[in-house]
Amino acid sequence: MATLLLEDGTIESNLDEIARELAPLGVYIKHYDPGTSILFPHLLIQDALTDKEKCHIVDLHNSVFEFIQQENGYLWCDLLNVHPGSPNLQTLIATYAKYHTHTAPEALYVLAGEMIFGFVKPDGSQVQLLVQSQDYLHIPSGVEHWCSLTASLSFKAVRYFTAADGWVPNYTGTQLNDSLNK
C-alpha cells in the first residue's frame, strides 16, 4: 500500500489522505487487488523474464484491467521488469531520477516491488510517494516529478501509454529537496 512523505517529515499512509494531497496535481492513485497475481506468483519473484512470460503477465492483467485502458485512452501497454541484473540499470536510474515532465500521461500498475515518485506541488513544496504491489498510479502530462527504485532494485509494473513514443522525459532543472532524503 502506498505511503506519502511530506516536506515537513509527516508520513501519510491513509490512501484517501494521500489522494487528497496529490489532487492539486491531478495525480490519481488507487489500490486494486484483482487477484491476478495468484495466477503467476512464480513469475513475480523471478528476476529475468522471457518475452513470452512478459506477454503472459500483461495478457492476464489486461483481461481484468481493460477498463483502465478504455477510461484513460491508453493505446498500448508493456511490462517494466527491473532487477539488480537488468542491463543498463544505472542508465535507467539516472534517466528518471531528475525532475522532469512528459507530454503524455504516465500510468502504471505495480505487480511486485516498489518505486518512489517525487512531486513538486503547486506551492513549491515537494513530496515523495512510495508505490507498492497493487497500486495504480496515473500522473497527468506536464506534472513535474521524478522516480527511482528503492534499495531492492526490484520492480515489476504494467505501464500504460497514450503515445507511440512512450514517456520521453523533459528535464526541468528543479533540485530534489534534500530534507526528504534523510
Swiss-Prot record:
Q: What is its EC number?
A: 1.13.11.54, 1.13.11.53
Write down the chemical reaction(s) this protein catalyses. 1,2-dihydroxy-5-(methylsulfanyl)pent-1-en-3-one + O2 = 3-(methylsulfanyl)propanoate + CO + formate + 2 H(+); 1,2-dihydroxy-5-(methylsulfanyl)pent-1-en-3-one + O2 = 4-methylsulfanyl-2-oxobutanoate + formate + 2 H(+)
In which pathway is this protein known to take part?
A: Amino-acid biosynthesis; L-methionine biosynthesis via salvage pathway; L-methionine from S-methyl-5-thio-alpha-D-ribose 1-phosphate: step 5/6
Q: Which UniProt keywords apply?
A: Amino-acid biosynthesis, Dioxygenase, Iron, Metal-binding, Methionine biosynthesis, Nickel, Oxidoreductase
Phosphoprotein is among the record's keywords = no
Query: Any keyword Iron?
Result: yes
Indicate which residues the UniProt annotation says bind Ni(2+): 100, 102, 106, 145
Cofactor names = Fe(2+); Ni(2+)
What does the entry give for GO biological process?
A: L-methionine salvage from methylthioadenosine; L-methionine salvage from S-adenosylmethionine
Per UniProt, where does Fe(2+) bind? 100, 102, 106, 145
Name a GO molecular-function annotation: acireductone dioxygenase (Ni2+-requiring) activity
Co-factor binding comment: Binds 1 Fe(2+) cation per monomer.
> Where are the annotated coiled coils located?
none
Q: What is the uppermost EC class here?
A: oxidoreductase
Looking up HAMAP family in the UniProt record yields:
Salvage_MtnD
Query: What role is this protein assigned?
Result: Catalyzes 2 different reactions between oxygen and the acireductone 1,2-dihydroxy-3-keto-5-methylthiopentene (DHK-MTPene) depending upon the metal bound in the active site. Fe-containing acireductone dioxygenase (Fe-ARD) produces formate and 2-keto-4-methylthiobutyrate (KMTB), the alpha-ketoacid precursor of methionine in the methionine recycle pathway. Ni-containing acireductone dioxygenase (Ni-ARD) produces methylthiopropionate, carbon monoxide and formate, and does not lie on the methionine recycle pathway.
The similarity comment for this entry is: Belongs to the acireductone dioxygenase (ARD) family.
Q: What does the subunit section of this Swiss-Prot or TrEMBL entry state? A: Monomer.
Name recorded for this polypeptide: Acireductone dioxygenase
Q: What organism is this sequence from?
A: Trichormus variabilis (strain ATCC 29413 / PCC 7937) (Anabaena variabilis)
Q: Which gene codes for it?
A: mtnD
